[in-house]
Amino acid sequence: VIIAAADKIRRSCDTIGGRLFRAQRYANSLKEVARSRGYSDQQIDAFLDSKAERAKVREKRNVYFQNQGASNLDHASLCVLGYAEIARNSQIGYLLKAR
């Protein structure tokens, strides 16, 4: 959800960019956690490629946005949220940068 939220914010707000190497490192660390819990690379890839799982992640992301007073359909609110996340240096903010 963290990567999905950061990605949506960076795509919706022209004045916020993504720290793509950080996002890739974070994604790789999540894969390592899954491997350490016994999941195979094939299982991990199937999960990541699943349309149903992607829909669940989008729904959780949108609920997070709503809880923060933003909307996935309102670019201005996502910009405000993005700057707040950057200022807090949250997990989402760590993956974003002001341009």
Feature roles, as predicted:
Residues R11, F21-R22, R35:
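Generic signature of mature, soluble extracytoplasmic domains
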Residues G18-L20, Y39:
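Mid-length scaffold segments of soluble, non-membrane domains
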Residues V1-G18:
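Immediate post-signal-peptide N-terminus of mature secreted/exported proteins
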Residues R25-R99:
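Compact alpha-helical subdomains of small soluble proteins
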Residues V1, F21, R25-N28:
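Conserved glycine-rich, hydrophobic/aromatic-active-site segments
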